[in-house]
UniProtKB/Swiss-Prot annotation:
One of its GO terms (cellular component) is actin cortical patch. The keyword Glycoprotein does not apply. Residues 188-277, 440-529 form the EH domain. Residues 1139-1152, 1273-1282 have a biased composition (Acidic residues). Transmembrane segments: none annotated. Component of the PAN1 actin cytoskeleton-regulatory complex required for the internalization of endosomes during actin-coupled endocytosis. The complex links the site of endocytosis to the cell membrane-associated actin cytoskeleton. Mediates uptake of external molecules and vacuolar degradation of plasma membrane proteins. Plays a role in the proper organization of the cell membrane-associated actin cytoskeleton and promotes its destabilization. SUPFAM superfamilies: EF-hand. This is Actin cytoskeleton-regulatory complex protein PAN1. GO terms for biological process: endocytosis; endosomal transport. It comes from Podospora anserina (strain S / ATCC MYA-4624 / DSM 980 / FGSC 10383). Its main location: membrane.
Length: 1441
């Protein structure tokens, strides 16, 4: 930081405002001293106007007599120069001066205790004790260090290091607060402290993420758990762990290891405990940093000084006091002659800067000498700690070489983008201080302003890459420079940070390494001040929290009077938290009335009531008039209080009366609603225990649902048995109809069934016989029945299987519909169920639990009236029941004869029989409809009783549902009106009974005749008149009843007629609907039969066409086989001797592999013809593409990815875009997604590195080996040939035809799944194809089949020379067998295959006319056929008819 390397002062010189006595005494005791040339004249040193400074014992021998010299005598002027060894005379060594030294020590010790800053007092008050002049000796060698005891005294003023200039800084130790963590034991905490200290070392308070990861990985937990543990433990989100956080991490690891679950969030007590201890650690670090001297921070790292604690300074005038002039001198240079009596400029009033240590321990000086001769060497300004003086020093004497060249290169220039910069011309070996000089700062600021054209105040990372890259340094060095300069990882540099970066680059160019950590000299003032501000805020918060905690404000804020008003100040300390008055500390003084708010008793238990201010004045001091006046005032107050109480009582009475009226009104409304509920038609459906009924229904529904799988499995078993029986019946009938086909294939399966292996063996046997006959010239009679039998069996099995699948699908649909219906019913029941809240409310308001007595009595009264009303309604219904029984047998029941639920839920379209009997329905459809209707009605009734809405009928339209609901509402309304009329009549009857008048119940129930007035009230005085009136009323009543009876009969007759008419209409509609359904079913049956017939015709036509084409293909192939057989006849004869035609071993299977021509292709098996519906279309052959190399995915840790260092991103991009070896273009791996939050979790990086996807291998483009073989029902129940060596059709086919070309596409057969296997068009080599499984062969076993067709059905080109198997040639029609290696000319090519992509079927030997074969051999051309391509593209599908 300081540019003057020769200004070495003692360690104690770092203490501002303190004289350097400790170091000087130490120097006198343990360092060689220079000799004093002579005494000094009196000097005004700022300590009063003392006439002369007497000689003092300073640990050095006495001074010589004054000797006039021509040079200025050495003065202590605050500036230390290099020592002059041969100046003046040396004093002789002095062994000991105990008496003087003792007095000097005592005086100094007293003055240090009293005035630590004023150092001139002890010397001014020292006695004038001087040694005799004769004690001075001639010059002698430098004095040796003597053990005078002063070294210990000097050391007492220092913290460590004694007087040695090379003393190191005090060793820091990890200060862990002596606080007990509650979530771990004391033994565990001690272990964790030991482990923490051993891991972080001395001088550190936090553990880095890397060390923490290494320690936590020893637990052998998975990465996810460790990542979660880190997230919980790192409470400060700093990427480092304090000790409490480390202990918490170990505690969480122990939890995980013991099998417990890690919490999602920390408990509050643990979190607060850890945070408090972390704050204590941080505050202790902040306090140490605040107490440490600024000079102790700004030191050269090579020689760390002893950090001293500064003492408070009274004023600037006391910074520099009188200096000791009798000390050993330092040669200040050859200055001009100066009298020794001249005053020296020691009264400098500016703040004294801290001085760097001097390794030799020589005497220190404080201020520069202001003599007239001037100074020999320039003095550098020392940093004073003021923000304006941030680490800036003067330019060293050697200057700043090459700084101009660096500035010129860094300036913005034209065409700089195309230039390549190196360090040539910028490197040097100059001595560069750590601190930034003033000249450097000026240049760097101008450079910053030149680049910051928009005056944004910062330079972004992209600009920094361009600017700093012009220095020519390596990118790793520039990356480290950026990391040091960009404080806080902001991604940009301000002016000071840019100066730091340029200074580091300039030092690097001069041979200095880039440091790992930014030294204190280069910390910008903005960063330092910001950190200090944060520390200040933390200290203030800590002090306030401590104050509140100690004062108990957190527990009783109103009791302690602690203010919550914000009073923080950054300029001065507050007077105290408790000295302010504001609203936050208001507290009602309960002691004024002598009561506590909590206990309601006198303060101080039995202590008397404290005197109030009013009682302080004694009553004796008041006169009688004053007392009367006070009495009158109190009387007025009491009257006012009484008046106020009366007023409040009246208001309360009014409110009580109003509340009573409202309560009575509510009671009346509740009673009315309860009466409506009791008299409602659906009141009888309310069950006392609906929950029990609901549970019973749920159990019944569950039992019915559990029976569904059993029924479905029984149906499936029956369907399977029916299918097996039908297939066996067809096999027997087919064997009876075609006897010759019965012995063609001998079944070896269970029960003699023909398995897949039997068919393959039979086909291989027939093929071998045909080839042998072709080679030997013999004829083998093969009947067409042998070839058609498997085809018929396969067709029948497909038909039976299709019907079985349809039936199974129907069963599944029934199961699904039943489950959905059951689920809907269960959901409706759950919606009507009561939870705990509703159950509590029900018990409260229905059972009267937890309510007031008045409300409970009212509830009980309602329940009693409800029960009475229900009993009366039941009695009334029971009384009317016999009178309506005859009408129920005669006519359909009216709305009153059936239950309300039935009349409400019945549909108008459903026919209703007289009496509801089941026998009235004649047809099964009507009976089924009646049963369904009755079931729906019962279900609706039970659901309505539970309060559940009935589900919508599946076959009911919206209009029908609306009509039904409208009818139900009308019926309900009509019934409610009747009930209201009846209830009103009953009420009038009760009123009449209570008043003693006759009950006019009948008159209230029916409409009264117009003009008739009610009879007058009875009179007790005239009994005869009353009797007469009663007789008249009885006669009128009888007449009225007769009229009403007639009207009722007329209405019932009309109603009966309407119902009969509606019934007839419904019957007619039902008949018409049944006839329409029958006609629709007949038409559907006709359409289905027509479709089946058409499909059968198409199938037969296609089969005939396929057979004809196969015949032609076999005919064309025979010619090629005859030509090939002539050359291999001898070889085949030898092999035929070892063949046993009847044997079914693997020898028969291996024969064709040796004799089959390489260019022949297998015929399509019957399984590909008949079982086309069972085959899944094979995937089309992909277009040939070059093999792609796996993409290289570059993964990085989150810390690297999230760093805003532009050079790091540049290096990462360079690593990603490094050219790989020449390879086909591969898809570029997507960059990792940006993460918004910087994660400092080291385990997060570990898990990301572990989760990086490994590059997959190259994708194979080869055709699958099986190529669809064995896919047509190899898992059939009848196939039990698992113990054969072939293990399936695919293996046997690969043995037989392993060397043949790829198979033809399925489109060549003309079947519905023609696009199942397209031709191989890829240039990639394909494996040898396998023969299709002949489960239901549609063609007879034939000699080697014809060549394959092109995939698109176009006529093929002439056959090229055949490729070797697996060579990857395109699937063109293969030629006849290849020529011999000797070079013999090949035979003529075979005739072109028939167009359309369908092979010609080969006719059986002996089955075709010999003349036709002769004509073909003679060269007769076949008739050109027209292509009718029905297969479409080889890669396209087809729609089945």
């Amino acid at each position: 930081m300081y540019s003057n390397p020769n200004s070495f002062l003692g360690g104690n010189s770092q203490r501002p405002g303190q004289p350097q006595y400790g170091n000087q005494f130490g120097a006198g005791a343990g360092q060689p001293q220079l000799q004093q040339p002579g005494p000094f004249a009196p000097q005004p040193t700022g300590f009063g106007q003392q006439p002369a400074l007497q000689q003092q014992y300073t640990g050095y021998p006495g001074l010589q007599a004054p000797q006039p010299t021509g040079q200025l005598q050495p003065q202590f002027t605050g500036f230390g120069q290099a020592p002059q060894q041969n100046v003046g005379a040396a004093a002789p060594p002095m062994p000991a001066m105990p008496q003087q030294f003792q007095q000097q020590f005592q005086q100094q010790q007293q003055q240090f205790q009293q005035q630590p800053q004023q150092t001139s007092s002890p010397f001014g008050a020292a006695p004038s004790q001087q040694p005799p002049a004769s004690a001075l000796a001639p010059p002698a060698p430098p004095m040796k260090p003597q053990p005078t005891g002063f070294h210990e005294m000097a050391a007492s003023f220092q913290t460590a290091g004694g007087s040695k200039s090379t003393a190191s800084a005090p060793r820091k130790t990890n200060k862990i607060p002596n606080i007990r963590l509650s979530f771990i034991t004391a033994q565990d905490q001690a272990k964790f402290e030991t482990l923490f200290k051993s891991a972080v070392g001395d001088g550190q308070t936090t553990m880095t993420g890397e060390k923490a990861r290494d320690l936590l990985l020893r637990s052998r937990l998975d990465g996810d758990s460790l990542s979660h543990i880190w997230t919980l433990a790192d409470t400060t989100r700093s990427g480092q762990l304090h000790f409490p956080e480390f202990a918490l991490a170990m505690y969480l690891c122990n939890l995980k290891l013991t099998g417990k679950t890690l919490p999602e969030h920390l408990p509050e007590n643990i979190k607060n405990e850890v945070s408090s201890m972390v704050d204590i650690i941080n505050f202790s670090v902040a306090e140490e940093a605040a107490n440490a001297s600024d000079s102790g921070i700004r030191q050269n790292t090579a020689t760390p000084p002893v950090i001293q604690h500064p003492q408070p300074q009274p004023s600037n005038s006391q910074l520099l006091q009188a200096q000791m002039t009798g000390f050993p001198s330092q040669q200040t240079g050859f200055l001009g002659a100066q009298p020794t009596g001249m005053p020296q400029a020691t009264g400098y009033t500016g703040p004294r800067p801290p001085m760097p240590p001097m390794p030799t321990g020589f005497g220190s000086s404080l201020t520069p000498n202001a003599g007239p001769g001037g100074m020999v060497a320039p003095l550098n300004a020392q940093p004073t700690g003021i923000p304006g003086q941030w680490g800036l020093v003067n330019t060293p004497a050697t200057g700043l070489p090459l700084i101009d060249a660096l500035q010129a290169r860094m300036m913005p220039q034209q065409g700089r983008e195309q230039q390549t910069y190196t360090t040539a011309g910028l490197q040097g070996n100059a001595v560069i201080p750590w601190a930034i000089t003033k000249d450097e700062k000026t240049r760097y600021d101008s450079l910053f302003r030149a680049w910051d054209g928009l005056h944004k105040g910062y330079i972004s990372g992209d600009q920094a890459i361009e600017i700093l890259g012009q220095s020519g340094l390596e990118k790793p060095d520039l990356e480290r420079v950026w990391t040091l300069a960009d404080n806080g990882n902001k991604g940009r540099l301000d002016m000071d940070e840019f100066a730091v970066a340029m200074h580091l680059i300039y030092r690097k160019l001069n041979g200095y390494p880039v440091p790992n950590q930014l030294p204190p000299e280069l910390v910008p003032p903005s960063t330092r001040n910001f950190n200090q501000s944060i520390g200040m805020v933390k200290n203030m918060l800590h002090q306030e929290s401590e104050y509140r905690k100690n004062s108990g404000a957190a527990l009783l804020p109103q009791k302690t009077g602690v203010s919550y008003l914000k009073g923080h100040s950054f300029k001065g300390a507050g007077a105290g938290f408790g000295n302010r008055k504001d609203a936050t500390v208001f507290k009602n003084n309960d002691e004024e009335v002598g009561y506590r708010s909590s206990a309601r008793r006198r303060v101080g238990n039995n202590s008397p009531r404290p005197e109030s201010p009013a009682s302080v004045n004694s009553s004796e001091e008041l006169s009688i008039e004053q007392l009367r006046k006070k009495i009158k005032e109190k009387q007025v107050l009491l009257d006012a209080m009484d008046f106020a109480d009366e007023k409040h009582a009246e208001e309360d009475d009014i409110l009580d009366r109003r509340d009573r009226r409202e309560a009575d009104e509510l009671y009346r409304r509740i009673r009315r609603i309860q009466e409506d509920i009791d008299n409602h038609p659906d009141a009888s459906l309310i069950s006392a225990d609906s929950d029990a009924e609901r549970r019973a229904l749920k159990r019944q529904l569950q039992n019915l649902t559990d029976k569904i799988p059993d029924l479905a499995s029984q149906v499936r078993k029956t369907e399977k048995a029916i299918a097996d029986a039908r297939l066996e019946l067809f096999r027997l009938r087919d064997a009876k109809a075609h006897p010759s086909s019965a012995a063609a294939i001998i079944g070896t399966g269970p029960g003699g069934t023909v398995t897949e292996s039997d068919r393959l063996k039979a086909r291989a046997k027939a093929m071998m016989q045909q080839r042998t006959a072709a080679l030997t010239g013999k004829k083998i009679e093969v009947s067409n029945d042998d070839l058609d039998a498997p085809k018929r069996l396969e067709e029948e099995s497909i038909k039976i299987r299709t019907e079985k699948e349809n039936n199974e699908r129907m069963v599944r649909d029934v199961e699904d519909s039943v489950r959905e219906f059951a689920k809907g019913i269960e959901d409706n029941m759950k919606e009507g169920a009561q939870d705990s809240t509703t159950e509590h409310e029900k018990r409260r308001w229905e059972d009267g639990l937890g309510v007031e007595d008045e409300v409970r009595d009212f509830i009980y009264d309602l329940q009693r009236s409800s029960r009475a009303a229900r009993i009366r309604s039941q009695d009334r219904q029971g009384g009317r029941q016999p009178t309506q029984e005859p009408t129920r047998a005669e006519a359909p029941p009216s709305a009153r004869s059936v239950s309300p639920a039935v009349s409400r839920t019945s549909t108008p379209s459903a026919p209703v029989a007289g009496g509801g009997s089941y026998s009235s329905y004649k047809t099964p459809e009507e009976r089924a409809a009646f049963i369904k209707q009755q079931a729906e009605q019962r279900m609706a009734e039970r659901l309505a009783a539970l309060g559940i809405k009935a589900p919508t009928k599946p076959g009911e339209t919206a209009a029908q549902r609306m009509e039904r609901e409208r009818a139900e509402r009308a019926a309900k309304l009509r019934q409610a009106e009747e009930e209201d009329a009846r209830r009103e009549a009953e009420r009038q009857a009760r009123i009449a009974e209570e008043t003693g008048a006759p009950a006019p119940a009948a008159q209230a129930a029916v409409p009264k005749p117009e003009g008739k007035k009610p009879p007058p009230p009875p009179s007790r005085k005239t009994p005869k008149v009353d009797d007469r009136r009663a007789e008249e009323e009885a006669a009128a009543r009888k007449a009225e009843e007769g009229r009403l009876e007639r009207e009722r009969g007329e209405q019932e007759r009309q109603t009966r007629e309407l119902e009969e008419r509606a019934k007839d209409q419904e019957d007619e509609l039902a008949k018409e609907r049944a006839e329409a359904d029958a006609r629709l079913k007949a038409l559907e049956e006709q359409v289905r039969q027509g479709k089946l017939k058409k499909e059968e015709e198409k199938r037969k036509k296609k089969a005939a066409m396929a057979e004809a084409k196969e015949q032609e293909a076999k005919l064309a192939q025979r010619r090629a086989e005859i030509e090939a057989a002539r050359k291999r006849e001898e070889e085949l004869r030898k092999q035929l001797e070892a063949l046993d035609v009847e044997d079914s071993s693997s020898d028969d299977d291996e024969g064709p592999e040796q004799i089959t021509p390489q260019a022949s292709t297998p015929t399509l098996g019957g399984s590909q013809v008949g079982g086309s519906q069972e085959l899944e279309p094979a995937p089309p052959t992909p277009v040939p593409a070059p093999v792609q190399s796996p993409p290289q995915i570059v993964t990085s840790s989150p810390a690297e990815t999230e760093s805003r260092n532009p050079y790091f991103r540049m290096r990462a991009q360079a690593a990603e875009t490094t050219p790989a070896p020449p390879a086909p273009p591969a898809p570029v791996a997507p960059p990792p997604p940006p993460q918004p939050d910087v994660s400092t979790n080291p385990f997060h990086r570990m898990t990301q590195a572990a989760a990086a996807p490994a590059p997959s291998g190259p994708v194979s483009r080869k055709r699958p080996e099986d190529d669809g073989w064995g896919s047509d029902k190899e898992d059939d129940d009848e196939d039990s040939d698992d113990d054969r060596p072939g293990q399936g059709a695919a293996h046997l086919a690969s043995i037989l035809f392993g060397t043949m070309a790829p198979p033809r596409p399925l489109s060549a057969t003309g079947d519905k799944s023609a696009a199942a296997s397209p031709p191989v068009t890829s240039p990639v080599a394909s494996p040898p194809p396998a023969i299709p499984s002949p489960t239901a062969a549609g063609a007879p076993p034939a000699p080697p089949p014809p060549p394959p067709m092109p995939g698109m059905g176009a006529p093929p080109p002439p056959p090229p020379p055949p490729p070797m198997p697996g060579s990857g040639a395109p699937a063109a029609p293969p030629p006849p067998p290849p020529p011999a290696p000797g070079g013999a000319p090949p035979p003529p090519p075979p005739p072109p295959p028939p167009p359309g992509g369908a092979p010609a079927p080969a006719a059986p030997a002996g089955g075709r006319p010999a003349a036709f074969l002769g004509e073909i051999q003679a060269g007769r051309a076949l008739r050109k056929t027209q292509t009718k391509d029905k297969s479409g593209a080889a890669v396209a599908g087809r729609v089945l008819d």
